[in-house]
Amino acid sequence: MKIQKDNLTPKQKRNAYLWIIFLSILLFSFFYYKSYLKENRKELLSENTEITFCKIIGSNTYKSTTNYLEYNVNGKDYETRPLSSRVFNIGEFYEIKYSKLNPEISEVNYTKPIIFNRNKFDQINGIIDKTYESEHLSVLSFKYNYENKEYERDIILEKIENLKKGNEIKILVNKKKPKISYLEKQFKAE
């Protein structure tokens, strides 16, 4: 078997090798920078942080699940679009931790919803439909009937504990937006 000679001139070969080296450096730089940003983000969120609340203003499920969040720090509005395991309802409020050094860097805590006016919610009973628990995520799904309409809701909890499928639970349902509901236990300590 004979290996055919290429038809490239020495100058063309050199240019091809330079392009390969350039693209390799560019690719390496991209992954290094991405890794640096991830580490920098972790560092900024591990120390010198504050907690405030954020409002869900939109969501997207095109390639991945993303919630659009808006929060305010020292009179300045910030918007973030973190990846999420679930789509939450527009108008919900959650706790968000942000870096004091760079308030654009934040992390939402979906296990801590915020209710500003408890009078806007009714307490009713719901039935646990399913539970999911892993090392990083605990999801409780429940069904409820509000004003003769059936609703389903997934919420993220720190731990599922003794909540089992079929158990009856007390939930809080938003009177104007019944799709928004929470496990009453999430607010017992407040």
Residue ranges of model-derived segments:
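Oxidizing extracytosolic/periplasmic lumen-facing domains
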Residues: 1-190
